[in-house]
């Protein structure tokens, strides 16, 4: 019922102990971050359920924007923060938030609500849960169901990237082929790395890419450098790192996390601008890898 045995391929890499601990051990969450971990566990002699739960002192890093709610709550005389958040920090990826059998969800929800009330927190929020969880919990204990949008690519039985292209209109096929030719025709070498193919030095380079992206408009680099060291140590087999090299020097990269049947694209950055390289590394290389 829990995420998975350590070392096994998780359905969702973001709710594994190793991912959440990488955030905490690296200082990306914890004291001073506005994300204070308060995980819930459910036991029946042995662990039978868990929930990633955080006391939040702000709304940053959630990718669900409730600042208007916070302002309205405080204009009415209340204090919106701290609040209680069921979520994976900095990760707007849909996945299970109730790590238990369906019949045990209500026990975890009751415990989270009790924690909210006992600590006089303003509210309880559950973000990016599965559709099944949302439907099962809507209306329970006054929970309001809010729907947002995401874009997911699905493999409809494709054996090759060409099969995928053949499923598109002629205009879109030509556009993607042209973009790939542009990105791949500039003398760069593109490598998709996972597991022991990833070297510690690759993270030094990717950290610079991550910082560059975070420094741009609307960007916020929530992760610390130590986070990348932690995931290299504990979950590099769950990572696909796509890098573009100019000779021996990496000039751009995209970081993906590998689930049991899903590839999750998360971060991108570069030290040089090259036409169409963002699309190549973040989308087309990832789709290629997922199909293979």
State what each model feature region is:
Residues 1-2, 42, 90, 285-292:
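Short, intrinsically disordered, charge-balanced linker/junction segments flanking boundaries
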Residues 88, 92, 102-106, 110, ...:
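Short, amphipathic alpha-helical segments
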Residues 77-84, 89-95, 165-169, 192-196, ...:
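Noncatalytic linker/hinge segments flanking ATPase motor cores
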